[in-house]
C-alpha cells in the first residue's frame, strides 16, 4: 500500500519537532541537525520537515512513497500519462536515505515526488 509523503520547510526545527511530535503523538523516526521525519501508520504518511537555506518555507513538496519497485513502476506510468514533464532522478541519496525517484509538477506548480526507498 502506498504512503502519502509531505515535506514542510520550517523556520525553527526544534519548535516544529515539539509541535509535530505532540500533534502526531510520536517522536520522529529520523532526526538530523536540519531534518526530522515521522513514518506514521495512522494516518499513513511519511511526514518530513527541514530547516535551512535549501528549504522553502511551507509545503516544499508532496509525494507518493511506493512500497515496492513494481508499485513505483505503476506510479511512474501514471506520472507519464499526466501529460506534464517528468524529471527522472533515478537512484539517489536524499533525506538521509537511498531512493529511486521521479518528480513532476501539477499545472499550478505544486511539486510531487514519486519514490521507493530500500
List each model region and its residues:
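Short, charged/polar surface micro-motifs in flexible loops or helix N-caps
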Residues: 42-46, 54-57, 67-72
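Short aromatic/hydrophobic contact patches that present stacked aromatics
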Residues: 5-7, 37, 61-63, 101-103
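A short linear hydrophobic-aromatic micro-motif
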Residues: 27, 47-48, 85-89
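Conserved catalytic-core motifs of GNAT/GCN5-like acyltransferases
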Residues: 27-33, 91-93, 116-118
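Short acidic/glycine-enriched loop/turn segments that link adjacent beta-strands
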Residues: 32-35, 56, 95-100
